Design a protein with these regions (language model features):
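N-terminal signal peptide c-region/cleavage motif recognized by signal peptidases
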Residues: 17-19
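Acidic, small-residue rich beta-repeat scaffolds with periodic aromatic anchors
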Residues: 21-33, 158-243, 373
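Short beta-strand elements that form the blades of beta-propeller/WD-repeat-like
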Residues: 37-73, 113-125, 178-187
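Aromatic (tryptophan-biased) beta-strands that constitute blades/sheets of beta-rich domains
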Residues: 54, 62, 66-100, 133-163, ...
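Short, solvent-exposed loop/turn segments at conserved positions within beta-propeller repeat blades
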Residues: 69-77, 124-129, 192-197
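Blade-loop segments of beta-propeller domains
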Residues: 88-113, 118-120
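Mature extracytoplasmic domains of secretory-pathway proteins
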Residues: 111, 142-152, 284-343
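N-terminal, charge-rich interaction modules
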Residues: 230-299
Length: 390
C-alpha cells in the first residue's frame, strides 16, 4: 500500500481536521472618499446589521435582509455625494442605494463627481456580480462587473483564496482621461509566498468595458495562470484521493509531515474527534542544530501546560528508543496524577503500547498509539461530508 505524502495530509488538515480559520473582518462602518480635486466627496453608509454572526446565520437560513435589526427594512448600502461650494459648505448632489448588500470594501469618486466606482463586498472580496460597480454622476448604475468579466476563470482559480475572499487586486485609481486602472494580482508559478506582482486592468468609465488584456504582458500572465490553475486542480485531486485512502505514516521523516499525520490520525481514530482537538508535538533529530527547542516543547506539553482532560499527540524524528528515553526523563519530574484525565497519543508500533503505558502510569494519563504501519480508514461520515462538496 502506498503511503500518503505529508503535503497532502497538511491540505486535508487545513480543510477538514479542524475548523477552518475564518477571515477577520471588522463590522462595516461609514466611510468618506474625496475626489482628487478635493471638491467632491461621497459618504457610504453600510446597511445596518445586528452583528456579522446574525448576518451569516440569516444567509444560511435564507432570511433577507440578512442580519437586519428589528424594524429595519433597508436592503442595500447607501451613498451620498456632496459638492464643496465656494462658501466652503458641502452641498448634497444625490443620495441613493448602491448594489452592495452591506457595504463595498473601497470606493473612488472622480473629479467633478462625474463617476462613482465601488469595489468588492464586505466580507467577500472577489465574489459576486459587483466586484466593480460604476455609477454616473446621478447615481445611475453604468455597469457592474464580476471578477470573471475582468480576468479568466483560470486566473481566478490561480489566485490566493481565503475562507471568504479572493485576493485579486491592489489599490485602483482613476485617470483624468476617464479610465479606471485596477492592479490585478498576477499568479506566481514558482513561489506563492513572495511579494505579489500586479498587471493593470483598464476599464472605460463611460460604459464599463475592459479595454486591456491583449498585450504580451497579459498573455504571459494568463499563460502562467493557466499553469498554476492546472497545478491546483491536480493537487486538489491528489488531496481528495489522499483523504479517501487509508492513512499510513509519512513517507518522509520530517517535522511538518509528522504534524500532519498526527492530526489526521486523531480525526480518523479518536471517538471524541467531533468535540476535541489534539495538540501535536514532534521531537526533532538530536543531531539537528535546533533540537533543544523541540525537547523544550516536549517538556512543556507533558509538564508545564494545563492539559486537564486534554488530548496530546506525539511523534519523533529521532529514533523511537531515544524518544522513549527523553519522555521517561521528563516524566521523572511529574507529580503523581499530574495528567489525570488527559489522553496521550504516540506515533509508535502497536507493540510499544505496554511500554508507553508503563512510562505514563504514574501520571494518570490514558495512552494510545497511532501505528504508522497500520492503515487507518477514513470515517464514513467525514468521507460523506467531504464528497458532498463536489
Amino acid at each position: 500500500m502506498t503511503r500518503i505524502h505529508s503535503h497532502l495530509l497538511l491540505a486535508l488538515l487545513a480543510c477538514w481536521a479542524a475548523p477552518s480559520n475564518a477571515d477577520s473582518w471588522l463590522p462595516a462602518e461609514p466611510k468618506i472618499y474625496v475626489s482628487p480635486d478635493q471638491t467632491y466627496r461621497v459618504r457610504i453608509d453600510p446597511r445596518p446589521i445586528t452583528s456579522p454572526l446574525a448576518y451569516f446565520s440569516d444567509k444560511v437560513k435564507g432570511r433577507e435582509p440578512a442580519g437586519a435589526p428589528k424594524g429595519h427594512k433597508d436592503s442595500k448600502a447607501t451613498a451620498t455625494i456632496e459638492h464643496l461650494e465656494n462658501a466652503g459648505q458641502w452641498i448634497r448632489i444625490w443620495s441613493g442605494n448602491l448594489s452592495n448588500q452591506v457595504a463595498p470594501v473601497d470606493a473612488l469618486i472622480a473629479d467633478g463627481g462625474k463617476y462613482l466606482v465601488t469595489f468588492d463586498n464586505w466580507h467577500s472580496m472577489g465574489y459576486g456580480q459587483n466586484v466593480v460597480a460604476i455609477y454616473d454622476g446621478h447615481g445611475q448604475l453604468i455597469r457592474a462587473l464580476a471578477l470573471s468579466d475582468i480576468v479568466s476563470a483560470d486566473h481566478i482559480a490561480a489566485l490566493q483564496h481565503s475562507v471568504s475572499s479572493i485576493q485579486w487586486r491592489g489599490e485602483p485609481h482613476l485617470t483624468p482621461e476617464g479610465l479606471l486602472v485596477i492592479p490585478i494580482v498576477v499568479p506566481d508559478a514558482q513561489d506563492e509566498s513572495k511579494e505579489e506582482t500586479y498587471l493593470d486592468a483598464v476599464l472605460r468609465l463611460s460604459d464599463g468595458p475592459v479595454i486591456s488584456g491583449s498585450s504580451p504582458d497579459w498573455q504571459r500572465a494568463e499563460a502562467t495562470a493557466q499553469f498554476v490553475a492546472r497545478q491546483k486542480r491536480d493537487y486538489e485531486e491528489q488531496a481528495k484521493q489522499a483523504f479517501i485512502a487509508p492513512l499510513l505514516g509519512p513517507s518522509e521523516n520530517t517535522e511538518r509531515n509528522w504534524h500532519g499525520y498526527l492530526n489526521e490520525a486523531f480525526y480518523r481514530s479518536s471517538p471524541d474527534w467531533k468535540d476535541e482537538t489534539t495538540s501535536t508535538t514532534v521531537l526533532r533529530d538530536p543531531n539537528a542544530p535546533d533540537y533543544a527547542a523541540s525537547e523544550g516543547w516536549l517538556r512543556d506539553a507533558l509538564l508545564s501546560l494545563d492539559y486537564e482532560h486534554g488530548t496530546m499527540s506525539f511523534a519523533s524524528i529521532a529514533p523511537f528508543d531515544f524518544f522513549v528515553a527523553r519522555v521517561k526523563a521528563i516524566l521523572a519530574d511529574a507529580e503523581p496524577g499530574q495528567l489525570k484525565g488527559s489522553k496521550v497519543h504516540v506515533a509508535a508500533p502497536t507493540s510499544a503500547l505496554p511500554l508507553l503505558q508503563t512510562i505514563f502510569a504514574k501520571t494518570g494519563a490514558r495512552v494510545f498509539v497511532f501505528d504508522p504501519n497500520i492503515p487507518i480508514p477514513q470515517r464514513p461520515d467525514r468521507l460523506k461530508r467531504y464528497l458532498s462538496r463536489d
